[in-house]
């Protein structure tokens, strides 16, 4: 049973829209310095901006002003594939064909957090709130990028005859593969407003920003807007 003055344990279910950004510091494609790696990864894969809709569940305790809660969420997997071809004709004889194939996956596997929230009681119904959150998050990502360059030699034929294209005499391929897994403790902030439908049931609209931390050359941040209900026992 709920305690007096709005105190007691509670559960909350939310549907969250997350704007996700994952940033990689890959070596530049033109890097030639000692100890660097030539990469064909495009800027698109360096700064991934995507979004997802996911559920979140929380359990906590309301102290009548302050609340603490533990929450858990899983995020969807992101996939992307890019392919491009360019053909250049040099000196009317030499043709160079460049093919780029890039594949990427991104999975914010899970987030387990603990938050402390303070409710501002404006009246009997509306309660804006702010808070802080610490969470243990798991993020996976992988990139597979290849660049293939093929050279053809074209020679002019006899008068009225079609030119002759020789078999490829130059074929080079560069590859860049990378896979990282982040398991870090990150920090975030929370804000929102609650509307009491009944003394025990609250409609909650919230926002949270979370920095998931950094592993080597990978940084991951999310901005989330959510709508849910909170039931206090």
From Swiss-Prot:
Q: Which InterPro entries match?
A: OM_autotransptr_brl_dom (IPR006315), OMP/PagP_b-brl (IPR011250), Porin_opacity (IPR003394)
| Pfam families given in the database record | Opacity
Per the record, its GO cellular-component terms are: cell outer membrane
Similarity comment text for this entry? Belongs to the opacity porin family.
Q: What is this protein called?
A: Opacity protein opA67
Q: Which UniProt keywords apply?
A: Cell outer membrane, Membrane, Signal, Transmembrane, Transmembrane beta strand
Q: Say which domain of life the source belongs to.
A: Bacteria
Which GO molecular function annotations are given, in alphabetical order?
Answer: porin activity
Q: Where is the signal peptide?
A: 1
Function of this protein?
Implicated in a number of adherence functions. OPA proteins are implicated in pathogenesis and are subject to phase variation.
Compartments, as annotated in UniProt: Cell outer membrane
- SUPFAM superfamilies attached to this UniProt entry: OMPA-like
The record's section on NCBIfam families has: autotrans_barl
């Amino acid at each position: 049973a709920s305690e007096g003055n709005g105190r007691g344990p509670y559960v909350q279910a939310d549907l969250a829209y997350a704007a996700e950004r994952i940033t990689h510091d890959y070596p530049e494609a033109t890097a030639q310095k000692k100890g660097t790696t030539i990469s064909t990864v495009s800027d698109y894969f360096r700064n991934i901006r995507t979004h997802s809709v996911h559920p979140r569940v929380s359990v906590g305790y309301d102290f009548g002003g302050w609340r603490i809660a533990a929450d858990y969420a899983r995020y969807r997997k992101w996939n992307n594939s890019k392919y491009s071809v360019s053909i250049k004709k040099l000196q009317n004889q030499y043709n160079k064909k460049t093919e780029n194939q890039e594949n990427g996956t991104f999975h914010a596997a899970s987030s387990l957090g603990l938050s402390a929230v303070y409710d501002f009681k404006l009246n009997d119904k509306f309660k804006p709130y702010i808070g802080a959150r610490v969470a243990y998050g798991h993020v996976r990502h992988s990139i597979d990028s290849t660049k293939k360059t093929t050279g053809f030699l074209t020679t002019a034929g006899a008068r009225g005859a079609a030119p002759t294209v020789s078999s490829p005499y130059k074929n080079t391929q560069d590859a860049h593969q990378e896979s990282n897994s982040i398991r870090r403790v990150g920090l975030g902030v929370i804000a929102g407003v609650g509307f009491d439908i009944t003394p025990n049931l609250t409609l909650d609209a919230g926002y949270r920003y979370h920095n998931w931390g950094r592993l080597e050359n990978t940084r991951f941040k999310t901005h989330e807007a959510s709508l849910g209900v909170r039931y206090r026992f």
